[in-house]
Amino acid sequence: MLFGKRKRIVKRILIVEDEPLTAFDNETMLADLGYEVVATLDSFDDAITLLGREDIDLVLSDMRLSGERSGLDLARAAKERGIPVLFSTGYDVPEEGKAVAVGCLSKPYSERQLKNALEAVDRLLAGEQVKPAKGLELYITPDA
């Protein structure tokens, strides 16, 4: 039996956030935690373009984005491509959002809360049973 850290599933993250300071904070925290931030964007259109040409392991998206389309629209499109989405928002996620995202991390959150949330999502994507971290609501189960 091997002991040690399990290999991460989530390594490359796309941040989609319309608030510049929050986007910068997310970028900094993710880099500090050892994740590769593929890009930080503020709109559905830019995110969809990138999803079509980059390998992304997870999208960290606000519900409200610049432009006419929302994080919910982005989550629908990402799910069609097999890319999981974790919402990060201070708003309630509608039922439809719960059907297309892996979960939601409530704003505001600390680096530790973000780390715990991403570790929980990673374990969930690996098919493990997961207890949600503080401020995190998970929408899928390992059996889903």
PLM regions and their residue ranges:
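Two-component/phosphorelay signaling modules centered on CheY-like receiver
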Residues: P20-A39
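Acidic, metal-coordinating helix/loop segments flanking the phosphotransfer/catalytic sites
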Residues: E27, T40-L58, S66
